[in-house]
Amino acid sequence: MFTIITGAQFGDEGKGKIVDLLAKDYDIVARFQGGNNAGHTVRVGNEVYKLHLIPSGILLNARVLIGPGVVLNPEVLAKEIAMFEKHGIQVNAEKLGVDAKTSIIMPYHIEMDGLREESREKKIGTTKRGIGYAYIDKVARDEFRMAELVDQERFLARLEELAPQKEKEIATLGGDPKIVRDPALIERYLELGKQFATYITDVSREINKALDEGKHVMAEAAQGTHLDVIHGTQKFVTSSSTIAGSACANLGVGPTRVNNVIAIVKAYITRVGEGPLPTELTGELGERLQKAGGEFGTTTGRGRRCGWFDLPLLKKAIALNGYTEISLTKLDVLTGLNPIRICTGYTFKGENLDYPPELTADLAECMPVYEDLPGWETDLTEVKAFEELPENARNYVKRLEELMEVPINYISVGPGRAQTFKKE
């Protein structure tokens, strides 16, 4: 069985929590895109794990894989492995595999990313972690791959080949080109290469072999649908494809092998950084949602902008991903709000729309059309079953399900592993 999980909004939907919940039924969990510009927070008991590269399935018995569509900062990977080992969780080559073709984020990528963002008159909200520049080099065939990182001779030869051009690019951006051949940084990367040598694998072959043997494989996305580099709200997007089809392309698995595509959907909507958010709540109500939901980025710490549930954006996400089921998160955060609003469409230049316009600039001008539902006052964080929810909370979930026309199978009412239940 092959299952793909993606975020249906702008990221931060709670993918890590749901992956952690479901991973017990899977033999392999694989990350297929992005880098350490995304973050998952998983709570197990009193322990909190903040992950940026290693798939959330690491906390259970699954083998976890990092596919070749990821851009990997080896320093971040080393820190995550050390964090787990500090908690008594061994992350050896039997537990974690990294594809030999995975692109490496070099120190100069991070430098160039920061310089470019600072030079923009209008910021796009990059995390300045070198993600975009690593993807640029992948497309330009100027990348470093994991296979080169773990081979000192190849690594140094590749650096000599690429260094002159990278030094020129950094100088053009107003930076110090010495970072490209900094001896201390080179030595550190060679050390990291030795550390990761045993982790190298062929992710496509490993996943296809597992599927042939009847095993269960989960592909885990980072970010969210509307941050997709092609279909998202350009230019306020990430540098990779975040939708379900990307899992097949990046992991090297044929689309006919996909059995399920699960959407992770927040009961409201949030966005980090710049870009349109038609239902955005400003002032006291927006701050209340932000505080109640703990809406601060795992990666950047930036406060997330909050808004009411946006159905047109969800309709587009459903079309782009082909979802078979939905996991609804953070329902508890809406407690105490009355009414609770659902954006069912937009008005744009005198027209009524039930689907987002193609251009980002047009989406920014859309005004939401709302349907109001009565709220509830009961704390939901101890609820263990759908029938235990207050009537108005159940009605809200049912109405979302009706509007999205995709079944909601799981509901989350808190950050802990035990605070998610199946809707039956």
UniProtKB/Swiss-Prot annotation:
Its EC number is 6.3.4.4. Substrate binds at residues 298-304. Binds 1 Mg(2+) ion per subunit. CDD domains: AdSS. GO terms for biological process: 'de novo' AMP biosynthetic process; IMP metabolic process. Pathway: Purine metabolism; AMP biosynthesis via de novo pathway; AMP from IMP: step 1/2. Its main location: cytoplasm. The keyword Transmembrane does not apply. SUPFAM superfamilies: P-loop containing nucleoside triphosphate hydrolases. Keywords: Cytoplasm, GTP-binding, Ligase, Magnesium, Metal-binding, Nucleotide-binding, Purine biosynthesis. Plays an important role in the de novo pathway of purine nucleotide biosynthesis. Catalyzes the first committed step in the biosynthesis of AMP from IMP. Belongs to the adenylosuccinate synthetase family. Homodimer. This is Adenylosuccinate synthetase.
